């Protein structure tokens, strides 16, 4: 990949629209804009221009254009934007014209943000926050992504890393000048191990967050489980307010898990319909039941459905929190059978009890996701911080031992903290991250 090429890509959605934005970034961005529009406009102000094909002078569009000289831009490079009329023909003709200009090429997904990272405009954790903000579907996800984009994690990790570097410098000083009498080995060693232990405790405390950030980012998983014909698919359709699952009187209709995303009070909930739990000799249905068991084991909440005359299904050992729901309330008299232990009674057909069920799921999600802001939002962050704690733990345990070992573990702790913001080992992570971005970002 040539990082000195000038990139271009649509920065707005495809399809018919009022405006289509094309973003240009790289050393030739100003020249490209002048080639199409005749002259460079005043920086950072929209200007009306007639855009023309440089081959024959054909007018492409009358558009608003903007010129952003680097390095104070999103990508850290010279940038330009073309605000075209939103028709597909206009957009495609301008893109084709850009592709013919020397030094220009179409951008890959995430290419502009990749350059922002490489040019120091943001770090890796902040770039991940850009992706999370684009993918955010609920208010809670939006707030969390913006907090990360503002550098909440990056600032804290930078402070920890600075402390770890200070400890490493002290350890290396003790090694380098031990024979010169300028360093008080005993006093320094005691202070060093104490500082390393405090740093370890601070990072470890952050890790004890119940995985709130990752769960908010990925969604609180709620699995609907029960015997065949207990009303799982009907309930899924009612909760999602659309027909996403096939409903049939024939047992065993659902074989594969069906997922629906809900927004409950700003929290993302992933609702999963599963195959009915029963003993069966039918191999495909049996495989679906195995998958149901696996989803139950990893769920944040299991909604156990009990039809009239039925019993609470066997969910297996070690099941996650369970909400027992009596279904098909319209089929039996009274609000609830005597002695029933159900938490909620519902009828997907009449709507009775549905608000109570949604309230119960939302309460479980609020309890599971917590109310505090989380610093850690990705498994990559957690793995790096766990590695840091492990290295600092070894430093604390090496008091009185070889100082070379303590110095090496401090060096590895610094490296682990650097991985969060992308100070080390960034290329592979960039490739994985930006492959999931949209074109033009």
Curated annotation (Swiss-Prot):
Its localization reads: Cytoplasm
Its keywords, alphabetically, are: Cytoplasm, GTP-binding, Hydrolase, Magnesium, Metal-binding, Nucleotide-binding, Potassium, tRNA processing
In its UniProt entry, the species of origin is given as Methylobacterium radiotolerans (strain ATCC 27329 / DSM 1819 / JCM 2831 / NBRC 15690 / NCIMB 10815 / 0-1)
Which PANTHER family does the record cross-reference, listed alphabetically?
TRNA MODIFICATION GTPASE GTPBP3, TRNA MODIFICATION GTPASE GTPBP3, MITOCHONDRIAL
Q: What does this protein do?
A: Exhibits a very high intrinsic GTPase hydrolysis rate. Involved in the addition of a carboxymethylaminomethyl (cmnm) group at the wobble position (U34) of certain tRNAs, forming tRNA-cmnm(5)s(2)U34.
How does the cofactor attach, per the note? Answer: Binds 1 potassium ion per subunit.
The GO terms this record gives for MF are: GTP binding; GTPase activity; metal ion binding
Which residues are in the TrmE-type G domain?
Answer: 219-366
Q: Which domain of life is it from?
A: Bacteria
Cofactor(s) required, per the database record:
K(+)
Q: What is this protein's name? A: tRNA modification GTPase MnmE
Q: Record-annotated residues binding Mg(2+)?
A: 233, 254
EC numbers listed for it are 3.6.-.-
Entry's family note: Belongs to the TRAFAC class TrmE-Era-EngA-EngB-Septin-like GTPase superfamily. TrmE GTPase family.
Q: PROSITE patterns annotated for this entry?
A: G_TRME
Q: How does it assemble?
A: Homodimer. Heterotetramer of two MnmE and two MnmG subunits.
Q: Tell me a GO biological process for this protein.
A: tRNA methylation
Q: What is its main location?
A: cytoplasm
């Amino acid at each position: 990949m040539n990082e000195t090429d000038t990139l271009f890509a649509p920065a707005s959605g495809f399809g018919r629209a009022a405006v289509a934005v094309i973003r240009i970034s790289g050393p030739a961005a100003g020249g490209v804009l002048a080639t199409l529009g005749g002259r460079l406009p005043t920086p950072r102000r929209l200007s009306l221009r007639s855009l023309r094909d440089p081959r024959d002078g054909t007018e492409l569009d009358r558009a608003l254009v903007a010129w952003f000289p680097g390095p104070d831009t999103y990508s850290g490079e010279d940038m330009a934007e073309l605000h075209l009329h939103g028709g597909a023909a206009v957009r495609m003709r301008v893109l084709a014209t850009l592709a013919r200009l020397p030094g220009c090429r179409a951008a890959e997904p995430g290419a502009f943000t990749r350059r922002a990272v490489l040019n120091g405009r943001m770090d890796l954790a902040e770039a991940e926050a850009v992706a999370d903000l684009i993918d955010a579907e609920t208010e809670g996800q939006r707030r969390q992504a913006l907090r990360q984009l503002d550098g909440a994690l990056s600032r804290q990790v930078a402070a920890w890393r600075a402390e770890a570097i200070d400890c490493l410098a002290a350890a290396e000083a003790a090694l380098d000048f031990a024979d010169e009498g300028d360093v008080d080995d005993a006093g320094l060693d005691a202070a060093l191990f104490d500082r390393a232990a405090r740093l370890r405790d601070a990072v470890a405390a952050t890790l004890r967050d119940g995985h709130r950030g990752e769960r908010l980012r990925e969604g609180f998983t709620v699995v609907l489980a029960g015997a065949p014909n207990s009303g799982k698919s009907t309930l899924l359709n009612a909760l999602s307010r659309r027909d996403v699952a096939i409903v049939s009187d024939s047992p065993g209709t659902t074989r594969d898990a069906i997922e629906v995303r809900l927004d409950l009070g700003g929290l993302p909930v992933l609702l999963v319909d599963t195959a009915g739990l029963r003993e069966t000799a039918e191999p495909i249905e049996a495989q679906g039941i195995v998958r149901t068991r696996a989803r139950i084991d990893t769920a944040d909440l299991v909604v156990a459905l009990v039809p009239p005359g039925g019993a609470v299904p066997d969910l297996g050992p070690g099941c996650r929190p369970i909400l027992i729901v009596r279904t098909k309330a319209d089929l039996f008299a009274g609000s609830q059978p005597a002695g029933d232990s159900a938490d909620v009674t519902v009828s997907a057909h009449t709507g009775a009890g549905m608000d109570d069920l949604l309230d119960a799921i939302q309460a479980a999600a609020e309890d599971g996701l917590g109310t505090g802001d989380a610093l850690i939002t990705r498994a990559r962050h957690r793995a790096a911080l766990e590695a840091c704690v492990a290295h600092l733990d070894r430093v604390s345990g090496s008091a009185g031992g070889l100082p070379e070992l303590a110095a090496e573990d401090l060096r590895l702790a610094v490296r682990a903290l650097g991985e969060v913001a992308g100070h080390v080992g960034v290329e592979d992570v960039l490739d994985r991250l930006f492959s999931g971005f949209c074109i033009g970002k």
